Amino acid sequence: MWRLKIAEGGKDPYIYSTNNFVGRQTWEYDPDGGTPEERAQVDAARLHFYNNRFQVKPCGDLLWRFQILRENNFKQTIASVKIGDGEEITYEKATTAVRRAAHHLSALQTSDGHWPAQIAGPLFFLPPLVFCMYITGHLDSVFPEEYRKEILRYIYYHQNEDGGWGLHIEGHSTMFCTALNYICMRILGEGPDGGQDNACARARKWIHDHGGVTHIPSWGKTWLSILGVFDWCGSNPMPPEFWILPSFLPMHPAKMWCYCRLVYMPMSYLYGKRFVGPITPLILQLREELFTEPYEKVNWKKARHQCAKEDLYYPHPLLQDLIWDSLYLFTEPLLTRWPFNKLVREKALQVTMKHIHYEDETSRYITIGCVEKVLCMLACWVEDPNGDAFKKHLARVPDYLWVSEDGMTMQSFGSQEWDAGFAVQALLATNLVEEIAPTLAKGHDFIKKSQVRDNPSGDFKSMYRHISKGSWTFSDQDHGWQVSDCTAEGLKCCLLLSMLPPEIVGEKMEPERLYDSVNVLLSLQSKKGGLSAWEPAGAQEWLELLNPTEFFADIVVEHEYVECTGSAIQALVLFKKLYPGHRKKEIENFIANAVRFLEDTQTADGSWYGNWGVCFTYGSWFALGGLAAAGKTFANCAAIRKAVKFLLTTQREDGGWGESYLSSPKKIYVPLEGSRSNVVHTAWALMGLIHAGQAERDPAPLHRAAKLIINSQLEEGDWPQQEITGVFMKNCMLHYPMYRDIYPMWALAEYRRRVPLPSTPVCLT
């Protein structure tokens, strides 16, 4: 039986931590673990997901919940409430629903104070890790039988009805993910016609029906070339010389978005080496299975520009194709021949590897994310198969693996700090401090211990890194990468908790550490007034024309984001109230400029585009929270009036909101089909309207929304898992299972706190 371990480093000599592994979450399999009843509970959850996999595609993330609720001896003792047709919501009924949710959320907290969760959904995360272990000869040790069984379960359970796999679990089938998952099944032991429900044969038919793997996007071409299923001649060049360009050039890596930089860093190393893994009998079979013509007859030069229409979200501009062709025809032949291969290429490869080692060390070999992790790990193995760097990478592989009722997948990294920041704020909004004091104290401790205490090591600016001291990451302290909205939410938590008695919630954070957080936020505001996420924005927007991926948008340079801006305004307004003397003028200017950015980026229909959640509902909640914190109201701010109109217009008949993930790639509001509502979207919209003062004008829409949330609450006090709610890079969705626990409760807590409600009459006898 699978068991989640919390804050454990294990006995591996190649793993280390900056804070004794606080927030670390890893899974282990115990063949003798669990009672027959507990095993039956897991089997039932798996069967239920499988039977309903085409109706609700995100998992409920139930395995760790079963374990933690059992360990914490949780049993919901507060009776459920429902609101009938025509019935008013009373303060008492709202309180009951909030208490049930708060007690359940408290029971889900782990010993170190955080809330674990899957954060996955993209179907291209896991296969490259399997490829890497296959190439390096560590497949059996990293993925023994039970691991393989769960990986295959995940692949089977998320195969679309047409036989393919989408870019993410709710998406239409794509060549990229269908080919990757097909190869993954074959590496894990399935035959050409093997797999549950004829998975392999159906996938291969989909691939052939859509032109074969020559039509896989550029990232797929790279991985297939590394495996030896493709030829490097079929990939566009990724010259490592990029890393020795003069810094004044506009396309210098220092000007790139950090994730783009850290993907192409190891990719360019592997490309520069023209590395190819062992050509095994399986690789030769795959060459026969995946193409629509004999491998020897493939026109690799033509294949470079081929991409299946199902994968094509961002078509390459002509300028970009001309650049690739120039590099392919003229530059690469020169750089791969003497003397340039010795004078230039070797130096470029050495510099590239220096950057890879730096990024690995400063993230404790977690690396910035899962795509980058696998590429950097493979690059380290190519450099030295027996080196310590590769061994340190292997020690951190378990940090990325997650097991749910739908099988084992690879996390993007972790959302420990992100989820904890919102969970603590939601719990604070309940005003049930005495009932949940231990939960708040543990959450406070986790947040304080997770703050990044230092900047990246050494001369970090020469390694294209920004300050991180005082920030919070998305996951844990070891990860090391500052994020503006994570920092803002962490800062808000510490400030709010500092206003409560320390004997209840623990000692407040030292002012100097709060000042460090403020410094990070101030450093990330752009000239436009908006906040970037990881590093300062400012590179030329035209560089996006060089976006080499076909399925993402806006990935080349850092941008400003509505959510980061809204979060930062709220945090700094509260900080200014509690510490009025610290950098007063700078903070006032920051808030004024950030408000201007929010007003300038509002769309014509009154909404804001959400970059990290679905989508206009999500962005509008953050924007309205920021504007309200800065003193803007319905009366004095046209942007708020327009936003209120948008939210009221999109409310459903049942009182809820439901927005399709298609809003994100299409960049227009798309409602869920069938007039469905989603409790998480409803919570965001309800809180947005409360920020906008809707209770003072007409509370009826708020009552309708609250009724839907209350009536959707489950027996244990949580809410059902519905559609996927997270997104990144416009076109790929992320699954945040904790959102269904946090946001409906938070919205009800704000509703109970800020909307006047009648009390139930007391009958005197």
UniProtKB/Swiss-Prot annotation:
Tissue localization of expression: Highly expressed in thickened roots and root nodules. Detected in roots, hypocotyls and cotyledons of young seedlings.
Reactions the enzyme catalyzes: (S)-2,3-epoxysqualene = beta-amyrin
Any one GO molecular function term: beta-amyrin synthase activity
GO cellular component, one term: lipid droplet
Keywords: Isomerase, Repeat
Entry EC no(s): 5.4.99.39
Induction (free text): Up-regulated by methyl jasmonate (MeJA) and down-regulated by gibberellin A3 (GA3).
Start and stop residues of the PFTB repeats: 18-58, 98-140, 148-189, 401-437, 440-484, 514-556, 591-631, 640-681, 702-743
GO annotation, biological process: triterpenoid biosynthetic process
Gene3D superfamilies: 1.50.10.20
UniProt keyword Transport present: no
Catalytic site positions: 485
Matching SUPFAM superfamilies: Terpenoid cyclases/Protein prenyltransferases
PANTHER family: BETA-AMYRIN SYNTHASE-RELATED, TERPENE CYCLASE/MUTASE FAMILY MEMBER
Function: Oxidosqualene cyclase converting oxidosqualene into beta-amyrin, generating five rings and eight asymmetric centers in a single transformation. Required for the production of soyasaponins and glycyrrhizin.
Similarity section: Belongs to the terpene cyclase/mutase family.
Name this protein carries in UniProt: Beta-amyrin synthase
Source organism: Glycyrrhiza glabra (Licorice)
